[in-house]
């Protein structure tokens, strides 16, 4: 009987050790999962607060398609975004459902729906508070990079959005499709502008 018990005890100890190790692994897994979710929630909250403070925002931008560069100024107010390109002189005005392209040199304008147009990304990035919640992101001391594949008008677009970290600043957007790559960089951020009432009108004064 004593010999049998001596055989049982090591087996029991091994079993308990395995159970203890398994329990420890489960605890570590949930700690990592909780920490990851907490970090993600903190980043989401930080970005959402940043987006909410863009109602009187302006910045300079440089847009590139790989072969040419364009410069201009961007303005945001009351759920509308205005992009003024310097050369040629033209404006892109965007709201949630519609947009207008204005050629100031020719004094022409053309309206379009933003729902299936890549320019809708401007609205989503700058004015949709929940847009970033479904993104995968990487964070370090210098930057936060959000990345996601989205479908616009049946085309897959790889979207990357770069924020400077500490302080949080939107620095660059890269949208890549099968045949095109567009990058837009932002500088000279201003959050406390006073805008003229007509700046966000879909009809320029000379066409009214």
Please annotate each region the language model reported:
Residues 21-29:
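Sec-dependent signal peptide recognition
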Residues 35-36:
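N-terminal signal peptide c-region/cleavage motif recognized by signal peptidases
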Residues 39-46:
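Cleaved targeting-peptide boundary
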Residues 49-69:
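A short, Trp-centered hydrophobic/proline-enriched beta-strand micro-motif
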Residues 73-120, 182:
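An acidic-aromatic
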Residues 107-143:
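Flexible, surface-exposed loop/linker segments and immediately adjacent secondary-structure boundaries
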